[in-house]
């Protein structure tokens, strides 16, 4: 383990939100490549959990906890500073580390806004009560977000796409693990 990093357990609700790209400056700051266009989850979490890069990890192994002092947008990326990462050499040692934060530390979503991670795995049903599938992933097409559903037909895995816009989405029931849509099964 690198000096200053604490060994830790990955929280049960941990979500991978980015990775450390490189050192930034000489005072221990480092560049972060967030996986989201809105890095708000990175900014709200005071503790980040690091896993080594998937290949060639030489600096640390296992899960490490990092206490974040500050994180901010800089140009097209995010830069951050952490306790016990005091110089460029320490920051360089984190290069490639995968960043996880506890889902419980995300800021609350606004009304009728959802974190994609909360939608994955939900069952989708249309107004007629027909099961449309389970949310496998979401795609951003630029104009809108699209739900990618997975369902089985004749024993074969199939995919169906539904735009995630209010015209087609009647209700998102996170506690009920369900999305109600205005969409025909044969469309």
From Swiss-Prot:
Residues 111-187 form the PRC barrel domain. An accessory protein needed during the final step in the assembly of 30S ribosomal subunit, possibly for assembly of the head region. Essential for efficient processing of 16S rRNA. May be needed both before and after RbfA during the maturation of 16S rRNA. It has affinity for free ribosomal 30S subunits but not for 70S ribosomes. InterPro entries: PRC_barrel-like_sf, PRC_RimM, RimM, RimM_N, RimM_N_sf, Transl_B-barrel_sf. The PRC barrel domain binds ribosomal protein uS19. It holds the Pfam family RimM. Binds ribosomal protein uS19. The gene is rimM. GO terms for molecular function: ribosome binding. Keywords: Chaperone, Cytoplasm, Ribosome biogenesis, rRNA processing. This is Ribosome maturation factor RimM. The keyword Hydrolase does not apply. Belongs to the RimM family. It comes from Albidiferax ferrireducens (strain ATCC BAA-621 / DSM 15236 / T118) (Rhodoferax ferrireducens).
